[in-house]
UniProtKB/Swiss-Prot annotation:
ATP-dependent carboxylate-amine ligase which exhibits weak glutamate--cysteine ligase activity. It comes from the Bacteria. Pfam families: GCS2 (PF04107). It catalyses: L-cysteine + L-glutamate + ATP = gamma-L-glutamyl-L-cysteine + ADP + phosphate + H(+). The lineage of its organism: Bacteria, Pseudomonadati, Pseudomonadota, Gammaproteobacteria, Enterobacterales. It is an enzyme of class 6 (ligase). Its EC number is 6.3.2.2. HAMAP family: Glu_cys_ligase_2. InterPro entries: GCL_type2/YbdK_subfam (IPR050141), GCS2 (IPR006336), Gln_synth/guanido_kin_cat_dom (IPR014746), YbdK (IPR011793). Keywords: ATP-binding, Ligase, Nucleotide-binding. GO terms for biological process: modified amino acid biosynthetic process. This is Putative glutamate--cysteine ligase 2.
């Protein structure tokens, strides 16, 4: 399939996707019933969309194009009520978190969808292992060249986005010692990590043509980069966050990305170059492993900074942009989170350290999602 032309969209508009866990009480393992839930809610959703993701234990909630985080929050809140009622009717529950702490990937059923079945054929068991749960945020751009500039700018802050959203310390019944273990699942994919370097949209079109020569890339959706342009939407899509445990944190993360995008495209503070990516995977690893306690290194100067320090610096820089787009509440909430030193991964570990089981942890996550 050829790459579509870049669809011009209103700059800084927003779209958010949340991959949710469908679980089966009282054991709280992953269920294989997302298709049943989708059928139950599809005629009751008035804004946004509820749809499949890779496996039958995953349920994706997606907003429409939104002006700001308040509109997105309203759509998510309405979807949440409908989905929770349908889940209760079918004796199921819903929760966030980047991984299910004890599910077995061998049990996961890939959705009966042409694209996912083709992906299963290409990637084999890796697709079942990819039963992990992330938040994706789209930001509108006026042109393909703007999208490439924005992608490179946002890539500088991938460690910050990972650290702030880290919510996947447990996997396959084990404490991974990572704050965010979810991104590791994709390390075997040939397109894992950052997009190959291009400096403008014309070069990106040439890159995509080259990738399409393989038998594995049929559309932009087949690429698993941390951040990718989405020409059919006219957006840049950030894909590195764990799904948070609460809607409010998901909305705050979206506000952070929207405000950062506004700052990047209005101020143009960086002259991007390929060397920017020299330590990308090392800095990304620090965020996954240690969260905000990680240390990132500047590839140009060798300077090392804690993610806590650098995240506070980012929040300060983008505060004026956040005010202009109505995202100040998100930046203020994230500032409080960083100063407090709390994150969802540590809260999960604290629950287990206090004597809680992994089954009890999932139950707790379901209660958090419903607001109990």
């Amino acid at each position: 399939m050829p790459l579509p032309d870049f669809h011009v969209s209103e700059p800084f508009t927003l779209g958010i996707e949340l991959e949710m866990q469908v679980v089966n009480p009282p054991g709280y393992d992953l269920s294989q019933d997302s298709s049943m839930l989708i059928d139950a809610v599809k005629n009751k959703i008035t804004a946004g969309e509820v749809k499949h993701d890779i496996t039958e234990s995953m349920l994706e909630l997606a907003t429409d194009v939104c002006r700001d985080i308040n509109q997105a929050a309203g759509q998510f809140s309405a979807m949440q009520k409908v989905v929770l009622q349908a889940a209760a009717d079918h004796h199921l529950e819903i929760c966030g978190g980047g991984t299910h702490p004890f599910q077995k990937w061998q049990r996961q059923e890939v959705c009966d969808n042409e694209r996912y079945q083709r992906t299963l054929e290409n990637f084999g068991y890796l697709i079942q292992q990819a039963t992990v749960f992330g938040q994706h945020v789209h930001v509108g751009c006026a042109s393909g060249d703007d999208a490439i500039y924005l992608l490179h700018g946002l890539s500088r802050f991938v460690p910050h986005f990972i650290a702030l959203s880290a919510a996947s310390p447990y996997m396959q019944g084990t404490d991974t010692r990572f704050a965010s273990s979810r991104p590791n699942i994709f390390s075997a994919f040939p397109d894992n990590g950052p997009m190959p370097w291009v400096s403008n949209w014309q070069q990106f079109e040439a890159l995509f043509r080259c990738l399409s020569y393989t038998t594995m890339i049929d559309s932009i959706k087949d690429l698993h980069w941390d951040i990718r342009p989405s020409p059919h939407f006219g957006t840049v899509e950030v894909r590195v966050m764990d799904t948070p445990l609460t809607l409010s944190h998901a909305v705050n993360m979206a506000g952070l990305i929207q405000a950062t995008a506004h700052w990047l495209l209005t101020e143009r503070p960086f002259k991007h170059q390929e060397k920017d990516y020299l330590l990308y995977k090392f800095n990304r690893f620090q965020a996954c492993r240690y969260g905000l306690e990680g240390v990132i290194t500047d590839p140009h100067t060798g300077d090392r900074r804690s993610l806590t320090e650098d995240t506070l610096r980012l929040l300060e820089k983008i505060a004026p942009s956040a005010h202009k787009i109505g995202a100040s509440s998100a930046i203020e909430a994230l500032h409080r989170q960083v100063v407090s030193g709390l994150n969802e991964a540590q809260l999960m570990r604290d629950f287990v350290a206090d004597g809680g089981s992994l089954i009890g942890l999932v139950k707790k996550h379901c209660e958090i999602w419903t607001g109990e």
